[in-house]
């Protein structure tokens, strides 16, 4: 599907951070059924995985906001990393079934949620630009990892 700016987007997690910023740039609708492109942005347990499968059944173009958190070995229980890893695997499975789905595995994005993290962070605007780059690609992009 060739991207054009008039396409309708359904974005989860629009109250703050990246999801909120994306709504400033993209034409949005209030539900999955009406959209052309689903941006799966809100982390809420395993719900991102469930929404990914729902969007795939509706033949939507999908961008999942993942994390580089599943990378590496954790020395303590880290459910967030497990949930984001499940999103990675579901994306991979559906991609190879022909679904136009991509997972963007960001490192820290400079939002209030991670204001106390003392690590390098990318700007929200830069993260938006990464998503726009994916949208403009003429071919499917399976995954992309971006760390500051």
Which residues fall in each region the model found?
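N-terminal Rossmann NAD(P)H-binding glycine-rich loop of SDR-like oxidoreductase domains
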Residues: 9-25
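Structural signature of the Rossmann-like NAD(P)-dependent dehydrogenase/reductase core
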Residues: 11-12, 39-41, 61-67, 102-105
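Short acidic low-complexity segments
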Residues: 27-36
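NAD(P)-cofactor binding segment of oxidoreductase domains
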Residues: 38-62
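Catalytic loop of short-chain dehydrogenase/reductase
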Residues: 61-96, 107-114
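Conserved Rossmann-fold SDR core element
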Residues: 95-109, 140-143
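C-terminal helical subdomain
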Residues: 116-148
């Amino acid at each position: 599907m060739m991207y054009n700016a008039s396409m309708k987007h359904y974005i989860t997690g629009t109250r703050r951070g990246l999801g909120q910023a994306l709504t400033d740039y993209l034409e949005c609708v209030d539900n999955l059924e009406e959209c052309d492109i689903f941006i799966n942005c809100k982390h809420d347990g395993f719900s991102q995985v469930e929404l990914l499968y729902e969007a795939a059944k509706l033949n939507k173009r999908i961008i999942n906001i993942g994390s580089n958190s599943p990378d590496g070995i954790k020395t303590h229980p880290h459910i967030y990393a497990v949930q984001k890893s499940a999103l990675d695997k579901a994306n991979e499975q559906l991609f190879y079934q022909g679904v136009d789905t991509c997972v963007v595995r960001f490192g820290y994005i400079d939002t209030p949620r991670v204001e106390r993290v003392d690590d390098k962070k990318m700007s929200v605007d830069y993260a938006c630009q990464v998503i726009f780059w994916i949208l403009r690609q003429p071919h499917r992009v399976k995954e992309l990892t971006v760390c500051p």
